[in-house]
Amino acid sequence: MAQLQEWLGKIEYELLAGDPAVAVDDVIYDSRKAAPGKVFVCIPGSRADGHDFIPDVYEKGVRAFVVEKKLSELRIPEDPSVTVLRVPDARKALAYLAAERFGNPFRKMISIGVTGTKGKTTVTTMIRTILEASGKKAGLIGTTGCFIDGKRTPTVNTTPESYELHEDFAKMVEAGCEYVIMECSSQGFKLQRTCGLMYDCGIFLNISPDHIGPAEHESFEEYLACKAMLLSQCRKAIVNDDALHTDEVIRISGIAPEKVIRYSVKHDADVSVGAIEYISTPDFTGTRFTAKGLYEGEILLPLPGYFNIENTLAALTASALLSLPAEKVAEGVLSTSVNGRMEVVARTDRFTIFVDYAHNEVSMVSLLDTLRKDYKPERLVVIFGCGGNRSKDRRTGMGKAAAEAADFTVITSDNPRFEKPEDILRDIHEAYLEAGGKEENCILIADRRAAIRYAMEHAEKGDMIAVIGKGHEDYVEINGVRTHFLDREVILEEKEALKL
C-alpha cells in the first residue's frame, strides 16, 4: 500500500474531504474494477460520466476519489473515511497518477513517438525491426497491439488510455526493454493519454483531413493542434519536409528550430534520397534507393510505394539520431514486414494481390496513384467498402477515388455496424458514378469474401489487386457483433480453393 499523496506529484488539486495520506494500492477509472484500496478517477466521457458511478464504487469499498465537480454536485455518502480531491482535468490527473503508481517506467527507456494521418504503423514497426537488428530490445505500442518480448497483446485504441500505457511501460522495463516506440494518435493527445510524457524523439509524418466528426475532432484546426502536441512533448523532432502543414505544426508546437531534423524525398534535407528504382518481379515487390545526409547508404525496401520511401526516411533519420550502425539499419529495413500495410499476400502468373489499411480518400488516392505510376500494372483493381455509422463523406471520397484512379472496382462491405450493407454500397456506387466511373468497370458484392474471390477468379494477366480498408483488422462488425475476418487469411483460402 502507498499513501495517495505520494502519487500526486505534479497534480494541482483542492482537498474537498478527508486526508490525502489515505492508503491506496491502485488507480482505477472503470467502476467495474472497484475494490477497497483503489482511488477512483471520475472521468466525464461522451457516453457516461464517471461522477455518476461514485455511489456504486463506494458500495464496493472505494474511499478515495478524484473529481472535477464541486462536492455539492456529487452523491458521496457522509463518511469520515472518504477522501475527495478536486482537479481541473481528471484525464490529466489519471495520467500523472498512473505514472507514479507504476514508478515512472517511461523515463527508464529511450522513447520515440510517431504521429501522422497515415504511416504510423509502418514507421514504428520499421524502427522496432531496425533496433532489434542492431541488438537492442524494444517495446512497441500501436494500432496492431502492444509488443513486448516477442509477445503481442491487443490494444483497444492506437494510443491506449494513460493507465494502460504506464502499465505496459512497466512491463517493458521489467522485460529489459531499452527502447519504447509509440504510435501517437491525435485522439490520444486530445484525451490527455500521453500527458506528462517527454519523448526523446518525436516524428511527424503528415496530416490530411480525417477523424473529423462528432466523436473525434470538431475541426481540422483542432486536429492539427492535437498532432502538434507531440512536437511540444519531445527533446528532438523529426519532420517530413514534403508534407503539407509541416511548418505550421512546428510553429504551433513551439519547439525550437534547432531541435528539428527534416527529411525529404523531393529535395535536399538533413536526410534525403538519391536514385530510386521501383521493383516488381515474381519474387519481390518494393524499392531500391540511396539515402544521403545524416544517414548514407543503399536501401532495399520490401514495401511497395512512394509513400513507403517517405516512411523509411523517417525511420532512417531516427536511426541516425540514435547512432545505430548503417549496415544493421539496412538489414532491419529489408526484414520489415507490416501486417495490413501494403502487404503483398499472393502472387500468381496473372496477378499480385495485397492488403492495405487505406480507409479514406487521401490514403486511397495515394496508394492507387503510387501503384500505377511506379509499378505500371496492366490493370489496377481495387476492392473496398466503408464503415457504417461513420461520416458519409468517406463514402463519397472513396467512391470518387475509385472512379478516378482504378481500372476496375469491386465495392463491398467493411464494418457495416448497425447500417444495412446495401445502403453503404449504394452510397459509394452513386459517388463512383457521379465522379465519372463507368458501370461496366464496377461491381457491387456485399459479401467481402465473395468480392475477393471474384477479383481473383476474374483477374487478367498483369493485374494488381488492392484489398483495402481493413488492413490488419481481424474482424467484421455487424449489428454490434464482431466475427473473425482477416483479409490476408481469406485471400490465401480463396486462392487455394481456386487452385491458383
Give names to the regions the model predicted.
Residues M1-L15, P36-V39, D49, P257-K259, ...:
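ATP-dependent carboxylate-amine ligase
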Residues K10, E73-E78, A175, K190, ...:
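Acidic, Mg2+-coordinating active-site environments of NTP-dependent enzymes
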Residues L8, K92-A237, D241, D247-A256, ...:
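Phosphate-binding loop of NTP-binding sites
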Residues V67-K70, C184, N206, D241, ...:
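Short secondary-structure boundary segments
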Residues V67-E68, P88, G142, C184, ...:
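Short loop/edge segments at beta-strand edges and connector loops
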Residues M1-Y96, L300, P304-Y306, E493-L500:
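N-terminal leader/targeting and accessory segments in enzymes
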Residues V24, P36-G37, V62, S81, ...:
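Short, well-ordered alpha-helix to beta-strand connector turns
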Residues E59, R63-K69, A237-D241, V381-F384, ...:
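Short internal beta-strands
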